[in-house]
């Protein structure tokens, strides 16, 4: 059976992700007490159901300590995937304000006896981060701070489509001017490379457009940067595998996240496609989420 566990911070999109999995044919349960999960999996398997999705959050705080061991045990018999959704505190506060929803931990006792009850939304968010932090290392993290609901649904579907027999590597392009991604395991700064933004014809385009690809592909320094990052990844990916890592997010950042980082993320993904399961996300580029074109896969080094 394939089991998808959705966890993370309240307000980061767990309900959206669970709905996407339900549309994909998964049997979905929200806020299931973790200790019930093995029994539910056995029951559904006997009933002929082979796909289960469960959302787990801080409302199950009494059982969260059991989750690491439970995930390991379930993985012995099932294809278990963990999706950890995160977002910046500012984004979460804005979402709770707009929806007028109450945070699950608002009004709950603080772990600090001198504080009493958690009175502010920010306190509740930070307390939840502490509670669910141990689960982050088991899952593929997605920073939803800037994601629209339809984009998140698409990424969840891509996540479950990936083969689970090897390390999954996500290449994520981003712009430093919009902040660094919360879900990055490795981060590379490519702002030292020539910027297509200063060419007025290239400015409105992205690193997925052929004129920008041609501009960057003609520069030896760009290929030197790509070669160095590729060599680093090829050296260290075996060590991530030995550490039993299932997911690795490699963030590539330029100033605006539109040209250089997009091109390099796509090029690196094409190079590593034979060595790992790869997916590409362009956080800040104005591109269709389904337009992760493989134009750069056909680029040949000079």
From Swiss-Prot:
Residue positions binding ATP: 8-15
Keywords: ATP-binding, GTP-binding, Nucleotide-binding
Role played: Displays ATPase and GTPase activities.
Molecular function terms, GO-annotated: ATP binding; GTP binding
Residues given in the record as GTP binding sites: 57-60
PANTHER family: RNASE ADAPTER PROTEIN RAPZ
Domain of life: Bacteria
Protein name, UniProt field: Nucleotide-binding protein Bcep1808_2900
InterPro entries named among the record's database cross-references: P-loop_NTPase, RapZ-like, RapZ-like_N, RapZ_C
NCBIfam families per UniProt: PRK05416.1 (NF003828)
Family according to the record: Belongs to the RapZ-like family.
Originating species: Burkholderia vietnamiensis (strain G4 / LMG 22486)
